[in-house]
A protein has these predicted regions:
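Gly/Pro/Ser/Thr-rich low-complexity, intrinsically disordered segments predominantly at protein N-termini
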Residues: 1-182
Length: 182
């Protein structure tokens, strides 16, 4: 069941329910995500840790799944991991940075957990790209498969990749999937 709410109501609901993973889709329907279990939480941490180390060395700002972004289509989304270039982040006001940043990240990662519906995550990835995200990875540990989404290109499906390359969006970033598949 999806409940329609006003965007301004979402911010209040999200702030009052910080212990819940909430998103608002472009149709202003509230989406409640299943809580993350230990295995998915451990895998998410490995992804955000690798991205965070790269960010500390090369710049920009990286975020974990608790950050909600206001996308251009009106959706409020919280990817499992994301990154924004420093120049784009600095273009936001301090108030925008403190709230739900009104910006599509340059890069996003969604990690499929056992309770996630694959087609729902795939639709979310398409939404990210249409909102301006340059590179997105949908990591599916169950099938040891990664779907790579890029601006202006068809989705690429990688079977059992060991390392993902950040390409021109994140030059030099390589995400090791070895412990993600465990």
């Amino acid at each position: 069941m999806k409940v329609k709410i006003k965007p301004e109501q979402f911010e209040t609901i999200a702030l009052l329910n910080e212990d819940k993973a909430l998103e608002l889709n472009a149709n202003h329907e509230l989406e409640v995500m299943a809580p993350t279990g230990g295995t998915a939480g451990r895998k998410n941490r490995r992804i955000t840790q690798q991205l965070g180390i790269w960010t500390d060395n090369y710049g920009g700002e990286s975020f974990d799944s608790s950050t909600i972004f206001l996308l251009p289509n009106g959706a409020r989304r919280s990817p499992d991991a994301s990154w924004i270039s420093q120049s784009r982040w600095n273009a936001l006001t301090p108030q925008q940075q403190d709230g739900f940043p009104p910006i599509a990240p340059d890069f996003v990662v969604e990690l499929r957990s056992p309770s996630d519906d694959l087609s729902t995550l795939q639709a979310k990835m398409v939404e990210y790209i249409s909102s301006g995200v340059s590179l997105g990875w949908l990591i599916n540990p169950q099938d040891k498969q990664v779907e790579v989404y890029r601006q202006g290109r068809e989705k690429e499906v990688l079977h059992q990749p060991r390392i993902l390359d950040g390409e021109a969006v994140l030059p030099g970033f390589q995400l090791s999937l070895e412990k993600i598949y465990d």
